[in-house]
C-alpha cells in the first residue's frame, strides 16, 4: 500500500479493516475466555 489508488473507495477500505478488526477481537476474546474458564 505504497501508492493509494484513487479508484478505490475509502469507505470500502474502512469497512474491510473494521471487519478484520472485529474478527481479531472475537478470536482474542475466545482465547482469553478459554484461558479464564479452564
From Swiss-Prot:
GO biological process: photosynthesis
Keywords from the UniProt entry: Membrane, Photosynthesis, Photosystem II, Reaction center, Thylakoid, Transmembrane, Transmembrane helix
GO cellular component terms given for this protein: photosystem II reaction center; plasma membrane-derived thylakoid membrane
Broad class of the protein's primary localization: membrane
Keyword Secreted included in the entry's annotation: no
Membrane-spanning intervals of the chain: 17-37
InterPro entries: PSII_PsbL, PSII_PsbL_sf
Subcellular location(s) per record: Cellular thylakoid membrane
Protease keyword on record: no
Membrane topology: Single-pass membrane protein
Protein task: One of the components of the core complex of photosystem II (PSII). PSII is a light-driven water:plastoquinone oxidoreductase that uses light energy to abstract electrons from H(2)O, generating O(2) and a proton gradient subsequently used for ATP formation. It consists of a core antenna complex that captures photons, and an electron transfer chain that converts photonic excitation into a charge separation. This subunit is found at the monomer-monomer interface and is required for correct PSII assembly and/or dimerization.
Subunit record text: PSII is composed of 1 copy each of membrane proteins PsbA, PsbB, PsbC, PsbD, PsbE, PsbF, PsbH, PsbI, PsbJ, PsbK, PsbL, PsbM, PsbT, PsbX, PsbY, PsbZ, Psb30/Ycf12, peripheral proteins PsbO, CyanoQ (PsbQ), PsbU, PsbV and a large number of cofactors. It forms dimeric complexes.
Entry similarity comment: Belongs to the PsbL family.
Name this polypeptide is given: Photosystem II reaction center protein L
Amino acid at each position: 500500500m505504497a501508492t493509494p489508488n484513487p479508484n478505490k473507495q475509502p469507505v470500502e477500505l474502512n469497512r474491510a479493516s473494521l471487519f478484520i478488526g472485529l474478527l481479531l477481537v472475537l478470536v482474542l476474546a475466545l482465547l482469553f475466555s478459554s484461558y479464564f474458564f479452564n
